[in-house]
Amino acid sequence: MEHIEYEERVMISENDYKKVIDDLTNSGYKLEPFTIENIYFDNKDFYIDRNGMMLRIRNTSTGIHELTLKVRQSEGVLEINETVENHPQIDKCLDNKLLEFKPIITLKTTRIEIPIENYLLVIDKNEYLDVTDYDIEIEAETQQRAKEVMLELCKKYKLQYDSNYKVKSARAFERFKKGWR
């Protein structure tokens, strides 16, 4: 499946994370966190990352895996997904190093998704390498709508909007490249 994603994101502190969750709970939203494990791939020269792309396998507890390639566009991100059921060849391929692209980083996300009107509010707690960070994401039908909603949320919760936001995979790769071991 292929589609263009229109998203805006903002990094938040742990205190802001708790504040937003408390406010949404008190406003009557039923929050149901779930865990996602993303395994990001690249080669030794970081070809995928250097060319504005991201390749991952997202594991779920249901035995279904989603292979995703994201490619930056002038507006939005082209996302190509393929669902793969649990199959021993996946692990064999990774374990036997049959691919030029290797698993580089595993990132665990505890996610809350709330559909609101004509957008999706996503609240994430991310854990990778020795880092725990938090972010809020808005997915909407256009980039402009995503930004409008994000700016409204930032105003409501007194959050700092940064147009140079780095996605979690970029933050993890940056940390890895700085010599984390």
Regions found by a protein language model. Give the residues of each.
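Phosphate-end processing signature that detects enzymes handling 5′-triphosphorylated RNA
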Residues: 1-181
